[in-house]
């Protein structure tokens, strides 16, 4: 069922709006008098109403989460529609929303597919033309769409509350899921180019960067350098030694990359270490093992998801009892651990079990992108059964890929990232990293790893840090809860001014259900981390936030807490 309540302007309300608009009661009173006797025309009054709404605090509540125009650029247009930025739709409406060719918006949720064209009052709803009042527009480099129109066609209720200056929308669909039973990113131009890793053990890097490229599509088309990621990541490994997803996360989180393929081409075993990242990755979510619904939602909303499988094939030309070349279908059931990374780019719940070379209980498969060139499978793509032992066990989706000018400075001491975990045999812990401001700056955000799902966090800043006793003067700057494990950058509620040379601490309290060691740390764990640098950080830990100890006295390690600032 759908509900919609439009903004109705009565004469008395309009008169009040005009009296607010026109401050003087003398000369301009005659203007009001003339309007009272005139026919109330929408083109005259609606812009005044919209202006009055936009000048105040405008609140938009979507599925019980509140947004305001203090932080997000919502506005009411001259048709009295609340226009919302397309950039928030994916998370706010829990849907797929992408801009094609700068002039077309495709929104998908449940079984609905909406296509908006720039400045066109006709949209397509599941292939059928429908007329809307407020078309898709572009303003200040951002696309905007009517929340009322989205609500009408995505099974949302919509209410405008004039007294509170608040729009409210809520999903009232009877569907239990936001995703269809079949979905393929190839049909939506959201799959990156098929590439070939050759004889090197670089599948983990191809999977990570291909997944990132998919997330950026169709709005941005990039090809990132695998050579740079595999040869400049801080780990003591060659391209023949292989790797895994946390290595890629560390490389990206530290702003070492990504860099462009054309600037550091693949396959020559050479690299250019002084290249700078063309994107800054600020968020990478780790989806729980075998949570197929969440994996599908991530593909649907964001793009390709990096995952790991056990691959019994040695090359695109080899054979295996687990792979059917006729149907490009693979399923391994056994005890072997993952040895190969691929990208999930879709799924088909009805994909027949008869397409596989092994006997299976039921239908269904993920559609996956490999890094063995277009000669493998169906142009580089193959199907992996839902019943495969390892598919969907380790999953990463790159949800926060930002422009490289998002912050002026990064402060960090954990270039190898999340190598291990530290704790006091309980769910919560305090950790703090101390840094020195390089110039006059505003501290605006911090990042850390959530080592398990449903982690709750609180972030604090300590100015003018001298020693452990300074940690009693913490200023709260952010708090929240994270649904998935992963790497997160949290903007502060307020900026903290730092002077050049000032020592400061960023403090993290984190609580992770069922954890005993919830704090991510960097340390020398094995041959791969033999080159880790541990004398570049100053960190402290506490069980209660009152008694602190230098982390070097607990474990020879660095704490994974970074800080971000802008010049002032």
Please report, for each region that a protein language model flagged, where it lies by residue.
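Extracellular/oxidizing-compartment recognition motifs
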Residues: 89, 150, 476-479, 558, ...
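Catalytic-core signature of thiol
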Residues: 170-444, 449-480, 517-524
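Primary recognition of N-terminal secretory signal peptides and signal-anchoring hydrophobic helices
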Residues: 19-181
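Short proline/glycine- and polar residue-rich coil/turn motifs
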Residues: 479-486, 498
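Short, well-structured beta-strand segments enriched in hydrophobic/aromatic residues
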Residues: 446, 488-529
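Surface-exposed loop/turn positions
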Residues: 141, 303, 486, 500-502
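Short, surface-exposed beta-strand/loop patches at domain edges
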Residues: 509-568
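Sec-dependent N-terminal signal peptides of Gram-positive bacterial secreted proteins and lipoproteins
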Residues: 3-27
């Amino acid at each position: 069922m759908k509900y919609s309540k439009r903004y109705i302007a009565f004469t008395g309300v309009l008169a009040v709006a005009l009296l607010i608009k026109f401050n003087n009661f003398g000369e301009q009173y005659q203007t009001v008098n003339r309007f009272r006797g005139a026919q109330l025309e929408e083109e005259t009054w609606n812009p005044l109403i919209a202006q009055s709404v936009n000048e105040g605090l405008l609140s938009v509540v979507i599925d019980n989460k509140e947004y305001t125009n203090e932080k997000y650029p919502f506005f009411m247009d001259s048709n009295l529609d609340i226009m919302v930025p397309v950039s928030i739709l994916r998370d706010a409406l829990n849907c797929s929303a992408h801009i094609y060719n700068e002039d077309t918006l495709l929104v998908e949720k449940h079984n609905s597919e909406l296509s908006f064209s720039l400045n066109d009052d006709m949209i397509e709803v599941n292939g059928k033309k429908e007329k809307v009042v407020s078309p898709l527009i572009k303003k200040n480099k951002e696309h905007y769409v009517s929340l009322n129109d989205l609500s009408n066609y995505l099974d949302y209720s919509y209410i405008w509350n004039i007294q509170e200056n608040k729009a409210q929308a809520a999903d009232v669909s009877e569907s239990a899921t936001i995703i269809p039973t079949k979905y393929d990113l190839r049909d939506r131009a959201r799959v990156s180019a098929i590439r070939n890793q050759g004889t090197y053990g670089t599948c983990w890097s191809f999977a990570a960067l291909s997944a990132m490229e998919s997330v950026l599509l169709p709005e941005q088309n990039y090809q990132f350098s695998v050579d740079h990621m595999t040869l400049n990541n801080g780990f003591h490994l060659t391209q023949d030694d292989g790797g895994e997803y946390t290595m890629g996360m560390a490389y990206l989180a530290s702003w070492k990359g990504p860099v462009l393929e054309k600037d550091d081409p693949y396959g020559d075993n050479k690299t250019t270490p002084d290249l700078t990242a063309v994107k800054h990755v600020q968020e990478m979510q780790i989806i729980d093992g075998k949570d197929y619904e969440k994996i599908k939602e991530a593909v649907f909303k964001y793009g390709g998801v990096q995952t790991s499988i056990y691959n019994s094939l040695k090359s695109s030309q080899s054979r295996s009892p687990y792979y059917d070349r006729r149907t490009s279908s693979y399923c391994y059931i056994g005890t072997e651990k993952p040895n190969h990374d691929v990208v999930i780019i879709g799924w088909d719940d009805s994909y027949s079990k008869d397409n596989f070379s092994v006997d299976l209980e039921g239908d269904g498969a993920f559609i996956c992108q490999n890094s063995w060139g277009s000669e493998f499978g169906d142009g580089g793509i193959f199907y992996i059964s839902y019943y495969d032992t390892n598919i969907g066990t380790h999953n990463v989706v790159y949800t926060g890929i930002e422009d490289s000018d998002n912050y002026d400075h990064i402060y960090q001491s954990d270039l190898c990232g999340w190598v291990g975990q530290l704790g006091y045999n309980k769910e919560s812990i305090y950790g703090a990293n101390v840094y020195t401001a390089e110039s006059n700056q505003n501290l605006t955000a911090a990042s850390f790893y959530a080592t398990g799902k449903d982690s709750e966090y609180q972030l604090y800043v300590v100015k003018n840090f001298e020693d452990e006793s300074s940690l009693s003067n913490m200023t709260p700057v952010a708090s929240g809860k994270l649904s998935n494990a992963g790497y997160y950058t949290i903007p502060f509620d307020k900026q903290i001014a730092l002077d050049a040379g000032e020592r400061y601490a960023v403090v993290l309290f984190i609580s992770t259900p069922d954890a005993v060691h919830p704090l991510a740390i960097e340390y020398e764990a094995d041959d791969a981390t033999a080159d880790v640098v541990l004398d570049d950080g100053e960190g402290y830990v506490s069980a209660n936030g009152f008694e602190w100890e230098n982390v070097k006295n607990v474990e020879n390690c660095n704490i994974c807490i970074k800080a971000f600032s802008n010049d002032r």
